[in-house]
Amino acid sequence: MRTLWIVAVLLVGEGSLIQLWEMIFQEMGKGAAKKYGLYGCNCGMGHRGRPVDATDRCCSVHKCCYKKLTDCDPKTDRYSYSWENGAIVCGGDDPCRKEVCECDKATTICFRDNLDTYDKKYKIYLKFLCKKPEPC
């Protein structure tokens, strides 16, 4: 349980972290979520710089997605989702919560689709090496 909490705190530093972690776990298997906690310039807390690769870009896009949700609080909004025929389906009647879910869904799919770009040298990346971030 402690590991789950640590991963949730490190993963993106905001949002319904447990739900995002669960999505990544369900999509990619045990241990996948902890790979991204401190990855590159944008995974973990903050939006530190230009993405180092496509995997890091997934985190950058996720943070930008959250920033666009001006009438929502992605840091606390819990949402509902399900798995249908192997796909994540965001549900519920609240449009804000559904948008938070869609941001997390897109990130999960992005990680899956860019697994081949994951580079262990960026797993725990020193953020001072990051270049100025791209605007959202």
From Swiss-Prot:
One of its GO terms (biological process) is phospholipid metabolic process. Expressed by the venom gland. It is found in: Secreted. Its EC number is 3.1.1.4. Residues 1-15 form the signal peptide. Pfam families: Phospholip_A2_1 (PF00068). It catalyses: a 1,2-diacyl-sn-glycero-3-phosphocholine + H2O = a 1-acyl-sn-glycero-3-phosphocholine + a fatty acid + H(+). The active site is at residues 62, 104. PANTHER family: BASIC PHOSPHOLIPASE A2 PA-11-LIKE, PHOSPHOLIPASE A2 FAMILY MEMBER. This is Basic phospholipase A2 Tgc-K49.
